[in-house]
C-alpha cells in the first residue's frame, strides 16, 4: 500500500498538470490574427545588417513588407523558411519586401560569422538584421520564433502569425496587401 501511495501522488499531479495545459492551450486561431493596423516600430537596435545596408521603415514606405523573426537553429524557423523563400520569389517582383530579424536564442547564434554561414546555407538573399540584444524583438513585442509580421504600404502592422502553419492564410494576406493601393 505504501508503494502505491508513492506512485499515486506523482500520477495525480501529472494528470492535474496535463489538465491545466489543455485548458491553457491556445486555439488554432490564436497564432494567426489580423493586427489592429498599428505603426511598426522599425529596426533600431540591430547590431549588423546582412545582404543590405541598414533599412528604415521610412525607406520601406510604399511597399508591402514581410518581417520574419527567426534564428538559425530553431526547427520552427527552418520549417517556415521554404514558405518565406516561395513568397519572396513569387511576390518580390510585385513589391513585397522581406526583412529577416535574426534574434539569437543561444550565444553562438549571435556570432556574425555563424549568422553569415546560416544565411548562405539557407540561401537567404533578402536583408537580415542581427538583433543580438533583443532590442527589435522587444520593441515589436515579439515572443516567438518564428514570427511573421505583414506591414501595409503605410508601414502599419496589419497581420501577424506566430510559429508554423496557416501558410495559405499568410499568403492570402500578402496577396491582399499587394492588390491594395
Task: Give short role names for the model-derived ranges.
Residues 1-13:
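N-terminal Sec-pathway targeting helices
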Amino acid at each position: 500500500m505504501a508503494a502505491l501511495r508513492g506512485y499515486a501522488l506523482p500520477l495525480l499531479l501529472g494528470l492535474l498538470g496535463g489538465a491545466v495545459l489543455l485548458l491553457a492551450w491556445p486555439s488554432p486561431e490564436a497564432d494567426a490574427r489580423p493586427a489592429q493596423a498599428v505603426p511598426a516600430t522599425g529596426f533600431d537596435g540591430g547590431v549588423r545588417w546582412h545582404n543590405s545596408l541598414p533599412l528604415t521603415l521610412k525607406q520601406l514606405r510604399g511597399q508591402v513588407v514581410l518581417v520574419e523573426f527567426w534564428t538559425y537553429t530553431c526547427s520552427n524557423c527552418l520549417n517556415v523558411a521554404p514558405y518565406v523563400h516561395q513568397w519572396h520569389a513569387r511576390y518580390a517582383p510585385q513589391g513585397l519586401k522581406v526583412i529577416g530579424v535574426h534574434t539569437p536564442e543561444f550565444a553562438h547564434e549571435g556570432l556574425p560569422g555563424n549568422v553569415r554561414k546560416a544565411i548562405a546555407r539557407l540561401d537567404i538573399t533578402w536583408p537580415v538584421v542581427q538583433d543580438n540584444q533583443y532590442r527589435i524583438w522587444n520593441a515589436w513585442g515579439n515572443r516567438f520564433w518564428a514570427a511573421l509580421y505583414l506591414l501595409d504600404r503605410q508601414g502599419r502592422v496589419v497581420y501577424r502569425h506566430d510559429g508554423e502553419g496557416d501558410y495559405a492564410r499568410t499568403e492570402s494576406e500578402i496577396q491582399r496587401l499587394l492588390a491594395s493601393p
